[in-house]
Amino acid sequence: MNIHVTLVRQPVSYLLALLVAVSLSACGFHLRGSEALPPEMAVTYIQSGNPFSTLVDDFAAALRARGAKVTERLEDATAVLRIQENDTERDVLSVNTSGKVLEYELRQTIQFAVATAENLPIVESQTVSMSRAYLYKSTDVLGSEREKDAVRRTLQKSLVNMAMLRIGSTTR
């Protein structure tokens, strides 16, 4: 009897999984990173004031995840992603009764544009900005620095994803 129940459940579970997959694709659902890029961005060069920054690395990873090839030579590129601005600020959000900082807010703003190798605009200059708060413990400075770095990394990755969504929206 257990064998019969297992055999019946297995095809039903496959059928259910297939039904869910078809439903999601029919409604236009896409996994993150699967947003299509403009065809001109097949081979992209990333231009930045600091070519060794983690922001450039994050953009390169996001482009590769979407099927683009990232080149280090401008001559080989079919498109150029220009990082025009990358500003990070830190503000005090709250203090205790002694005047010691309890919470900070990190804010990052990036400005970018995409053009063809012939300098024809694909995506006009756009700005994306985001902020995140984190707790600061004066008794655990190393832990607080690690938390600040982790918040900064997730903030930057979120900004890159927002920028990629904007770039991908030009293909529609």
Regions found by a protein language model. Give the residues of each.
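Bacterial signal peptide processing site
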Residues: 28-31
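C-terminal motif of bacterial Sec signal peptides marking the signal peptidase cleavage site
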Residues: 22-26
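Surface-exposed short loop/turn segments
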Residues: 76, 82-127, 131-146
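N-terminal segment of the mature soluble domain
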Residues: 42-87
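Sec/Tat-exported extracytoplasmic proteins
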Residues: 63, 67, 114-118, 138, ...
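Acidic/histidine-rich, surface-exposed loop or edge segments in extracytoplasmic proteins
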Residues: 40-47, 140-144
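C-terminal/domain-edge helix-coil "capping" segments
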Residues: 142-172
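Bacterial N-terminal signal peptides that target proteins for export
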Residues: 3-16
